[in-house]
């Protein structure tokens, strides 16, 4: 701490002292440090306190003491910098627009080293409060001086290395030209030295070193060319306080580091830029662009604390007092920062980010790009997250909104078949690709295709003739072997192709109308009748809402009678809307053709939702054209041990019975079932038995 005792004179004489000192006068002011993102010096603060003494007279030679925490700078250096700052307009003050009136109000200016006094070259003790007002009014005006003094007396902030705003500072003599030139050279020399100090300090302080260092270099070049002193540079924050935008000189705001030795005053009332606490994002702010006034700046999101709001730069992210984790002062918006090129920063995880991303798209915005950008964004996000990830609800929303092929997103996901203990489908080869056959890991569609709306007089041979051009196939329909009929009884049939590539060719030849595929087929009496083609996409067999939850077979239900067009995503949404807590849904498919069998599974994340689902017993599935009543019961496994004896009373065999009553919900061997359910109140419980392994119906395939 440097103590400077100055007699009443035009020249300031410095004297070092380690004791605290007071500034004689009638008004006291307390100072708090305010850092600027464009300031290249270490943040310092000065404290000035007034002693309860009467002001001296005109002839008094009472010395005044000014205490600065200015490191290596002397008062002469500071006074020399006062001259140049008067004629240099400042940008980036609070509330947006020109910051000069606000800065001149307190006689402070940003010269790259901090806010300093403008347009003064001497310090003198003020003989009286009226004379002080008269001396300052010549420069500011009576109203401005009154407002300034009221602000200082009310305990307002006082920026570092600032003499402006004190009641006993007389601002009068204009500087000479040679003094201004000397001031500029000295200022640039000091700025270069302190910038090196800040660079060394940031290596230990800020995790955003590379981005901020790049930012300081850009701002240094702009200051030398005069670009950063644009009078109309927008600033951050709002309100009438001159300290709302403490980031003078940076048009878009920035995340300014605060040294650990400098505490932030608890008296802040407006917007104050804080450094990001905890794990800060890496250097994602490297993209520069030019604003409307031609000054380049980086689109760095600024975290605004308190009740500041309103106008400011486009990069401002307002954070209230809410939030959690290691940064409780951050609002929920922090996890959803996006860089200027539309790439989303990973702050709150994939689901939270994409939910906000898709919400913006649903409100009419472009969501950061078109469908192709959404596609690349999804793939980049999956690559950043790392590891196998399941499809989430936000992913499906992105697929639906972008209008792209869902397989593009699913190619990056691994939703392979789990073990026998998992309720996943045991045949779910979602491995992506652009075609191929079953078994080669690149299939996208089932080789079984539904054809509806056939002419009533069309037979099997005519159907085969109509679709043979796409590849070898077999025509099948329900109960074909028993009926011994050559005509599909209900106007629909299934095409069983030998190769999955034939399905791709069929889809390419179809006509699309309202997301449905049609192809013209002729019969002996009807020419070119449009029939519906409904292929089954393998990706629609599984859907995961919450990839962080492990699937528990004891919290999984079996849904019977599921309509074949119903997808796993649609089943999950229906069950989650009814009971909540759904983390997975799957559609049972046959092991050979991978086509839905008319049943599904839904896994819940909590016991309450599971019990509510099995207690309802029946559910009405309503989705689009689908309106069907389906049965819900516990999902029974055939490889579970008895929960009572753990295989000791049954020779280590798997338990054949499962009690679905909410008072039991356990697996039992035959012995334990008889013992437990002979008790009062349980004699009416009925066991559920796992049916045999899924076996496809034997079809005498003869590829035509």
From Swiss-Prot:
Cross-referenced InterPro entries = CEBP_ZZ, CEBP_ZZ_sf, CPEB, Nucleotide-bd_a/b_plait_sf, RBD_domain_sf, RRM_dom
Matches recorded under PROSITE patterns: RRM
Ranges for the region named Gln/His-rich are 163-240
The cross-references to Pfam families, in alphabetical order and at most eight, read: CEBP_ZZ, RRM_7
Q: Which domain of life is it from?
A: Eukaryota
Sorted keywords for this record are: Activator, Amyloid, Cell cycle, Cell division, Cell projection, Cytoplasm, Differentiation, Phosphoprotein, Repeat, Repressor, RNA-binding, Spermatogenesis, Synapse, Translation regulation
Changes after translation: Phosphorylation regulates interaction with Tob and oligomerization. Protein phosphatase 2A keeps both Orb2 and Tob in an unphosphorylated form. Following synaptic activation, unphosphorylated Orb2 is bound and stabilized by unphosphorylated Tob. Tob recruits activated LimK which phosphorylates both Orb2 and Tob and enhances Orb2 oligomerization.
What changes when the gene is disrupted? Substantially reduced viability with surviving males being completely sterile due to a failure of spermatocytes to complete meiosis with arrest happening at the G2-M transition. Defective spermatid cyst polarization. RNAi-mediated knockdown in motor neurons decreases number of synapses and accumulation of the tumor suppressor brat at neuromuscular junctions (NMJ). Simultaneous knockdown of the tumor suppressor brat restablishes the number of synapses at NMJ.
- Major subcellular site: other
What protein am I looking at?
Translational regulator orb2
This protein's species is: Drosophila melanogaster (Fruit fly)
């Amino acid at each position: 701490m440097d103590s400077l005792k100055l007699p009443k004179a035009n020249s300031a004489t410095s004297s070092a002292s380690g004791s605290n000192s007071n500034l004689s006068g009638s008004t006291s002011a307390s100072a708090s440090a305010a850092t600027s993102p464009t300031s290249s010096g270490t943040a310092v603060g000065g404290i000035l306190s007034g002693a309860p003494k009467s002001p001296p007279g005109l002839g008094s030679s009472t010395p005044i003491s000014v205490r600065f925490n200015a490191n290596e700078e002397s008062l002469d250096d500071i006074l020399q910098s006062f001259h140049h700052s008067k004629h240099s307009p400042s940008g980036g003050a609070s509330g947006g627009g020109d910051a000069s009136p606000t800065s001149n109000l307190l006689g402070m200016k940003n010269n790259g080293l901090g806010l300093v006094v403008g347009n003064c070259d001497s310090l003198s003790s003020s003989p009286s409060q009226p004379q002080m007002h008269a001396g300052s009014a010549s420069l500011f005006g009576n109203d401005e001086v009154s407002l300034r003094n009221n602000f200082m007396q009310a305990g307002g902030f006082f920026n570092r290395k600032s003499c402006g705003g004190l009641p006993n500072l007389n601002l009068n003599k204009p500087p000479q030209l040679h003094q201004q030139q000397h001031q500029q050279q000295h200022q640039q020399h000091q700025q270069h030295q302190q910038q090196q100090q800040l660079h060394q300090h940031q290596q230990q302080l800020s995790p955003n070193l590379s981005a901020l260092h790049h930012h300081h270099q850009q701002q240094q070049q702009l200051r030398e060319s005069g670009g950063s002193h644009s009078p109309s540079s927008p600033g951050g924050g709002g309100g009438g306080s001159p300290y709302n935008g403490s980031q003078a000189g940076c048009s878009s705001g920035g995340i300014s580091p605060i040294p650990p030795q400098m505490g932030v005053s608890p008296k802040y009332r407006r917007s104050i830029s804080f450094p990001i606490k905890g794990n800060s994002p890496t250097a994602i702010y490297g993209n520069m662009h030019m604003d409307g006034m031609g000054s380049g700046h980086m689109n760095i999101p600024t975290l605004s604390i308190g009740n500041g709001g309103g106008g400011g730069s486009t990069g401002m992210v307002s954070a209230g007092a809410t939030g959690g984790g290691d940064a409780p002062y951050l609002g929920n918006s922090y996890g959803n920062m996006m860089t200027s090129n539309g790439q989303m920063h990973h702050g709150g995880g994939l689901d939270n980010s994409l939910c906000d991303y898709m919400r913006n798209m649903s409100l009419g915005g472009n969501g950061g790009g078109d469908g192709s950008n959404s596609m690349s964004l999804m793939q980049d996000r999956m690559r950043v997250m790392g590891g196998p990830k399941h499809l989430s609800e936000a992913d499906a929303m992105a697929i639906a909104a972008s209008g792209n092929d869902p397989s593009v997103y699913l190619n990056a996901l691994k939703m392979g078949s789990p073990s026998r203990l998992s309720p996943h489908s045991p045949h779910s080869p979602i491995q992506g690709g652009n075609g191929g056959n079953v078994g080669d890991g690149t299939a996208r569609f089932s080789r079984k295709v539904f054809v509806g709306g056939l002419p009533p007089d069309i037979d099997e041979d005519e159907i085969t003739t109509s679709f043979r051009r796409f590849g070898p196939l077999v025509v099948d329909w329900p109960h074909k072997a028993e009926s011994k009929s050559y005509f599909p009884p209900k106007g629909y049939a299934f095409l069983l192709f030998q190769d999955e590539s034939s399905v791709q060719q069929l889809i390419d030849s179809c006509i699309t109308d309202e997301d449905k595929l049609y192809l013209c087929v002729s019969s002996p009496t009807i020419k070119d009748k449009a029939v519906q083609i409904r292929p089954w996409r393998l990706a629609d067999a599984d859907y995961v809402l919450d990839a962080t939850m492990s699937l528990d077979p004891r919290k999984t239900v079996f849904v019977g009678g599921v309509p074949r067009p119903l997808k796993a995503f649609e089943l999950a949404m229906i069950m989650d809307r009814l009971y909540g807590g759904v983390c997975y849904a799957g559609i049972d498919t046959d092991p050979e053709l991978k086509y839905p069998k008319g049943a599904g599974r839904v896994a819940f994340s909590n016991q309450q939702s599971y019990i509510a689902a099995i207690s309802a017993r029946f559910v009405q599935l309503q989705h689009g054209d689908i309106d069907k009543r389906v049965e819900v019961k516990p999902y029974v496994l055939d490889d579970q041990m008895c929960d009572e004896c753990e295989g000791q009373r049954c020779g280590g065999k798997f338990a054949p019975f499962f009690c679905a009553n909410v008072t039991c919900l356990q697996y039992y061997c035959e012995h334990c079932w008889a013992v437990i359910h002979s008790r009062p109140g349980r004699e009416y419980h009925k066991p559920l038995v796992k049916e045999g392994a899924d076996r496809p119906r034997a079809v005498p395939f003869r590829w035509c």
